[in-house]
Amino acid sequence: LSQSKGGNESTHLPAWDDLYEQTGAACPYNNSHFLNRLEDVYRCINRSAVIKGSNGPLGVPAFEVRTPLSGHKVTTAPFGFYPTILGDQDHRRALDYLTDLAAGLGRRAYVEYKVIGALPEACLARHNINVTTPTLAHVLPLEDSYKVLKRGFAKRHRESLQTIDKRVRKDGVEIVATRVETDVRAWFRLLVRLYRDKHLMVTQPWPLFRRLCMDEDMSPLAELMIARKQGHVVAGVVVLKGRHEWVYAWSAQDPVAEKDGLVKYILDQSLQKAISFGAKRFSFGLTPPSHKGLRDFKMKWGCHEEPVYHLYWNARPKNVDLQMSARRLRMAYRFVPLWLAERLPSFIVPRLA
């Protein structure tokens, strides 16, 4: 993480961590500890920097990634994560910084810039930007009390949570936060199986979860909450925590326990915890346009929808629907043995970027 003046005038610019702390609305993906973990796990180069914006310091997330499939690029959202620009929301100067970086890497290097909401046409034209069809980000504004927040849930969703709560108490299901390796590994196996059998894709690699969910210095940022039944991990949710915003990052449950609704229950517990910590937003992540079931699930919590645009400089847009693209081909992934599916992400994901 570095500083850059971003203009001809010399100015004192804060460090990335200082700007992150000053920015009340910052997403936990912008936390330098998280960004550094991405650099470690995926062997990419973190070029994020604080530059001079038109109205103050501007933090631009940027990663230099070189892959066999994607080529050489500078991206603000590597490997499916979406840090935002910090401080001054000057997208023109952010794009100036990113395109200058890419231009210095060779004529075929390109920029991938992901942003919530549409940018002005003048900004797009200045950089000759290509834009993809937007995906949807789902964000739940948090109230000062869980009781008030719950009123915004769909009625049947509230009733379902009450039923699950009674079942959890009756069955003696234990809901705990954990950083124990055996728990984290057990949950990771559930996640790999879910992605293999239902989503037909690889998940993020084990080294990322080991660092996020087990390293003690990451405990203020990342938390795995699990459901343990009769001594076995049967469900779990990973949330990333920021001062202003929490992010629902991953979840998985044992298919046998799916009817118990434990992911939904743990997510509800996480919402209550976020409110108690003073968070103002809870992000439910991105939703492919074709995934109606996932969108409906998020809307039951009272989420608001925000369009996320993928902008490209020196490259054609890549309209990829994670739900439907190459689905017939991906069906074969179901036949991969679980032990192999656990190891494949470490080899595949860094090459997809």
How should each PLM-predicted stretch be described?
Residues V65-Y82:
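Conserved acyl-donor/pantetheine-binding loop and adjacent beta-alpha core of acyl/acetyltransferases
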Residues V50, P57, G80, L95-A103, ...:
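Aromatic (often tryptophan-rich) hydrophobic motifs at membrane interfaces
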Residues Y110-E112, V176, R281-G285:
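Short catalytic-loop micro-motif centered on adjacent basic/acidic residues
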Residues V60, V65-T67, A122-L149, A279-A353:
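Active-site/acyl-donor-binding loops of N-acyltransferases
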Residues I45, R107-A109, G278:
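Short loop/turn motifs at secondary-structure junctions
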Residues A77-A118:
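A gly/proline- and charged-residue-enriched helix-loop-helix capping module
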Residues Q3-S54, L58-S70, I116-A137, E143-K259:
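A conserved beta-strand-loop-helix scaffold within acyl/acetyltransferase catalytic domains
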